[in-house]
Amino acid sequence: MLRWAVTFLIIALIAALFGFGGIAGASAGIAQILFFVFIALFAISLVARGLSGPSS
């Protein structure tokens, strides 16, 4: 049980370093860009699937 407590303490410290270090803001910007890229790819794949017709 102590091992789990130490493991979660280390994970929390690493998350705090990322959160308070300014990396979170940069990651949020990158995540927004990736979100729109994958939405566009999803829309393109839907259109391509619709244009190809029914498959047998």
UniProtKB/Swiss-Prot annotation:
<feature type="transmembrane region" description="Helical">
    <location>
        <begin position="29"/>
        <end position="48"/>
    </location>
</feature>
<dbReference type="Pfam" id="PF07043">
    <property type="entry name" value="DUF1328"/>
</dbReference>
<protein>
    <recommendedName>
        <fullName>UPF0391 membrane protein Jann_3570</fullName>
    </recommendedName>
</protein>
<keyword id="KW-0472">Membrane</keyword>
<feature type="transmembrane region" description="Helical">
    <location>
        <begin position="4"/>
        <end position="24"/>
    </location>
</feature>
<keyword id="KW-1133">Transmembrane helix</keyword>
<keyword id="KW-0812">Transmembrane</keyword>
<keyword id="KW-1003">Cell membrane</keyword>
<dbReference type="GO" id="GO:0005886">
    <property type="term" value="C:plasma membrane"/>
</dbReference>
<dbReference type="InterPro" id="IPR009760">
    <property type="entry name" value="DUF1328"/>
</dbReference>
<comment type="similarity">
    <text>Belongs to the UPF0391 family.</text>
</comment>
